[in-house]
């Protein structure tokens, strides 16, 4: 990532030498003394890595979960969850997690989010494969994908939620599975029909990066919902800088 890239360029002049002794005479002007010119690119500011767990200080952090690193800016009061997401409680409902921004890689999407056991399909690493699988998923509703830029890289954004009145307790393993890192168990599921997500799926030159912001219940504090969206929007990838 450009913010971490440090490159130093050194340019050295070529010395003029006499190739044949017969061509060098006392009458000729002496060859210039060798010189060396050095240009140094000042190192760019290096961002701290996002802590793996616990309360984190407000600021901008670097995350290395994907093919390219990304930056995320976090206000006060957020907690890091295993380095794969950030959560914050709703002050109006302190017993429940209010919002979450996640980004762990998932390579499997079930054809049916409720009857998901045996239907987890392995995906190729492209962004399109994940978007197509999610928007075609049975038992869920998705908005049409909209093209976005996530820093210097293109992607798409769409909303995702439970379709209709699904009895989640009756789903396989009591989980409403939307995607997973594995073929035989679920690593991202809804616990209630009230959960709502917005996804951004980024194309990193043929490789996928994916992010989602979650609202866990309908009566979420509006200020907290706006704050979660701001954290989600702060995620950016930057092209590596090239010096010449």
List PLM regions with ranges.
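Mixed-charge, low-complexity intrinsically disordered segments
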Residues: 162-200
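Second-shell loop/turn segments in exported
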Residues: 118-121, 144-145, 215-222
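N-terminal targeting sequences that direct proteins away from the cytosol to non-cytosolic compartments
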Residues: 2-106, 183-194, 202-207, 211-244
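Secretory pathway targeting signatures of secreted, lumenal, and periplasmic proteins
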Residues: 62-136, 147-156, 161-167, 172
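General secretory precursor processing signal
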Residues: 19-21, 27, 111, 116-119, ...
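Short glycine-rich, low-complexity/disordered patches
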Residues: 140-151, 239-244
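Alpha-helix-centered segments that form part of catalytic cores
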Residues: 124-135, 141-142, 190-201
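Generic structural motif
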Residues: 36, 141-145, 155-157
């Amino acid at each position: 990532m450009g913010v971490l890239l440090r490159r130093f360029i050194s340019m050295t002049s070529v010395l003029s030498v006499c190739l044949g002794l017969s061509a060098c005479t006392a009458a000729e002007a002496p060859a210039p003394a060798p010189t060396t010119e050095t240009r140094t690119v000042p190192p760019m500011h290096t961002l701290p890595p996002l802590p793996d767990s616990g309360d984190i200080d407000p600021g901008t952090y670097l995350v290395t979960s994907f093919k390219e690193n990304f930056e995320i800016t976090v206000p006060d009061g957020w907690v890091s969850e295993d380095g794969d997401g950030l959560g914050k409680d709703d002050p109006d409902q302190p017993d429940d997690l209010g919002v979450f921004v996640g980004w762990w890689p998932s390579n499997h999407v079930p054809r049916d989010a409720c009857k998901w056991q045996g239907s987890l399909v392995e995906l190729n690493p492209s962004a399109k494969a994940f978007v197509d699988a999610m928007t075609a998923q049975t038992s869920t509703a998705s908005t049409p994908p909209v093209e976005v830029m996530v820093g210097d890289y293109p992607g798409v954004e769409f909303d995702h939620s439970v379709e209709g009145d699904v009895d989640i307790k009756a789903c396989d393993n009591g989980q409403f599975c939307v995607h997973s890192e594995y073929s035989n168990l679920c690593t991202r599921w809804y616990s209630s029909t009230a959960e709502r997500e917005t996804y951004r799926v980024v194309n990193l030159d043929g490789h996928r990066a994916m992010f989602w912001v979650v609202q866990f219940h309908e009566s979420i504090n509006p200020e907290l919902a706006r704050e979660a969206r701001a954290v989600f929007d702060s995620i950016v990838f930057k092209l590596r800088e090239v010096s010449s």
